Regions:
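Feature for soluble, non-membrane regions of globular proteins
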Residues: 15-162
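Sec-dependent signal peptide recognition
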Residues: 1-10
Length: 162
């Protein structure tokens, strides 16, 4: 019995992870006028898909082949990191949109207002962070180790996991 369990565990841990492009949780035109269907299709169907395909090709035959996406982002560097982090970033990005529009509420809203004084002041600072980010990259609202909210700018594929 122990031999069978050991064999099954070996098979399970040697299965190759194949990353796929997540389906959008809304239609491509649902975010207009905030984001046009053309822009959404370009970023999801071209950029995001390219990162997924690149990552699958890059991890073949490496120690990353059986890892989940977050582990790859945390442990890799170079081209594998860049593509894995962009898959994670884009997936997170597309999951945040709501077709009905909304503002933060509850504990998040309270923490934002405590830190920035008002939700509008937060939006101004967040938008300014994006507008002043040189080149490509991401702007994140994060909670630091002490529980404080911060706006963080990351170049290229950088993200809060790293």
């Amino acid at each position: 019995m122990n031999l069978l369990i050991s064999f099954l565990l070996t098979i399970q841990t040697s299965v190759t992870m194949l990353f796929t492009l997540p389906a959008l949780p809304y239609t491509a035109e649902a975010l207009a006028p905030t984001m046009s269907q053309e822009t959404l299709n370009f970023h999801h169907g071209k950029h995001h898909l390219a990162y997924v395909n690149n990552l699958n090709n890059l991890v073949k035959g490496t120690r990353y082949e059986t890892m989940d996406l977050e582990a790859i982002v945390r442990e890799s560097d170079g081209a594998i990191f860049n593509n894995a982090a962009q898959v994670w970033n884009h997936t997170f990005f597309f999951e945040q949109f709501k077709t009905t529009g909304c503002e933060a509420k509850g504990n998040v809203r309270t923490a934002i207002e405590k830190k920035w004084g008002s939700f509008d002041a937060f939006k101004t600072e967040f938008n300014n962070a994006g507008a002043t980010l040189f080149g490509s990259g991401w702007v994140w609202l994060v909670k630091d180790a002490n529980g404080n909210l911060e706006i963080v700018k990351e170049s290229n594929a950088g993200n809060p996991l790293t």
